[in-house]
Curated annotation (Swiss-Prot):
S-S pairs: none
GO function terms (MF aspect): peptidyl-prolyl cis-trans isomerase activity; protein folding chaperone; ribosome binding
Gene: tig
Protein name, entry field: Trigger factor
Domain of life: Bacteria
Organism in which the protein naturally occurs: Synechococcus sp. (strain CC9311)
Domain PPIase FKBP-type residue range list: 174-261
Annotated compartments: Cytoplasm
Chain residue ranges for the region called Disordered: 430-449
């Protein structure tokens, strides 16, 4: 029976879902039943009969009519759905649900009689934009901060410093203290898990330890012991320690400091590929200016994309949302794995459920951005031509010449997506207005990185 003979009635449902009612003629339900008997006769083992040679009456008696009907219906449902989405050109996502449930459908299924099945499935969304031109947005402009050059030079000096022992003075800010310590909670006197050490190097810099610890060590002399009061911050990683007061018995066992190299041409050669300090400063300035420019562009485009999403009209299908949530969780797992963590033991079922729940808002936002750009490409007929794609694929392939297992089809698709996104964002900038807004004072400077 061809799919063209199916009578189909489709009704849109909320959440980018489609209800599809299919009228199945009697002859097709009978054909599925006959096919099920043939299928089971070839696979079932009955004493005294060869496979495929079991008489029909014996097969029905041994297996029971319910099993045969269930097999027939299962095959029928699968075949009808495949034929329906092909006939109606339905872009379905995932597997459909049978309205009323499979068990109820099985009860009403009689081979040789007409049958009506209502499927419900997520379908690809159809995003539209209320407008594409004249969008307005505000974005932070990132300025080059010359003071960051000196900060980066100081960081390099610290990395190249020589550690030497300290004699004849007390511990000071910036020193390296070798301490033994034991911590207990002030409220119940219990020992702090992980809060003790026989010997540990501690940089005496603000923020290295919980509040009160560094301040307590500063001013001590090698051989001194003292008890220091500390406070665990409210955002401390270990939940049971958050906000609690603690005391640490600290012994200063040794004291060291860093001798920084002179800020001169020799330092520049040691710290970089530059020959002089002046060249190193120029190189750092260029990097910071380029970084500020990239971040400014990124801020502008993020703001424009947010403005475009505000114009988006779409219903997100749950199938796509869950797929994007899984992608985010897998990315998190991959990041942990790259850091050397045991993902299998770390990612318990409870943690995965929590991650999936907390990742949902980001997943939905990512989908909206992607769909907004797709709608823009459709509305403005923006696309990438083959010569541009070929040139970029050639360039990327050359950069990945040492890599193995490169799928050329996936690489080409990734190149197309990147080029199209760049073109769409560029088009948005040309056809929208972005005004500068004051930086968020609570936000760390982007050039700190």
């Amino acid at each position: 029976m061809s799919a063209a003979s199916l009578k189909v009635t489709s009704t849109a449902r909320p959440g980018s879902r489609l209800a599809v009612e299919v009228a199945i003629p009697a002859e097709r339900s009978q054909a599925s039943y006959e096919a099920a008997i043939s299928q089971l006769s070839r696979s079932v083992n009955l004493p005294g009969f060869r496979k495929g040679k079991v008489p029909r009456s014996v097969l029905v008696q041994q297996l029971g009519g319910l099993r045969i009907r269930a097999t027939a219906l299962e095959n029928l449902v699968d075949a009808i759905w495949r034929d329906t989405i092909k006939q109606e050109t339905i872009e379905a996502l995932g597997q459909p649900e049978v309205d009323g449930g499979y068990e109820a459908l099985l009860e009403s299924f009689e081979p040789g009689k007409p049958l009506s099945i209502t499927f419900e499935a997520d379908v690809a969304p159809t995003p539209t934009l209320k407008t594409t031109k004249g969008l307005k947005a505000e974005a932070e402009s990132v300025s080059f901060d010359a003071a960051k050059v000196d900060e980066m030079l100081e960081q390099s000096r610290r990395q190249l410093a020589t550690v030497v022992p300290v004699e004849g003075r007390k511990a000071a800010q910036g020193d390296i203290a070798v301490v033994g310590f034991k911590g207990t909670y002030s409220d119940d006197g219990s020992e702090i898990e992980g809060g003790s050490s026989e010997s540990m190097d501690v940089d005496l810099e603000h923020g290295r330890m919980i509040p009160g610890f560094i301040e307590g060590v500063v001013g001590m002399t090698v051989g001194d012991s003292k008890t220091v009061a500390c406070n665990f911050p409210e955002d401390y990683p270990k939940e049971d320690a958050r906000g609690r007061k603690a005391s640490f018995e600290i012994e200063l066992k040794d004291l060291k400091t860093r001798e920084l190299p002179d800020l001169d041409d020799d330092f520049a050669k040691q710290a970089s590929e530059q020959e002089t300090l002046a060249e190193l400063r120029t190189d750092l300035e260029k990097r910071l200016k380029d970084d500020a420019e990239r971040r400014t562009t990124s801020n502008r485009r993020d703001a424009l994309l947010a403005a475009l999403v505000e114009q988006l009209e779409v219903e997100l299908p749950e199938t796509l949302v869950q797929q994007e949530v899984r992608n985010l969780v897998e990315q998190t797992a991959a990041q942990f794995s790259q850091q050397g963590m045991d993902v299998k033991s770390l990612f318990t079922p409870d943690l995965v459920r929590n991650l999936m729940e907390t990742s949902r808002p980001e997943a939905e936002e990512r989908l909206r951005r992607s769909l907004a750009l797709s709608a823009l490409a459709e509305a403005e007929s923006l696309k990438i031509e083959d010569p541009e794609i070929d040139a970029k694929v050639k360039e990327v392939t050359a950069q990945l010449s040492g890599e193995r297992d490169i799928d050329p089809n996936r690489l080409r698709q990734a190149v197309i997506e990147d080029l199209l996104q760049e073109k769409l964002l560029g088009w948005l900038e040309e056809n929208s207005t972005v005004t500068e807004k004051a930086p968020d004072k609570d936000k760390p400077s982007v050039t700190d990185a």
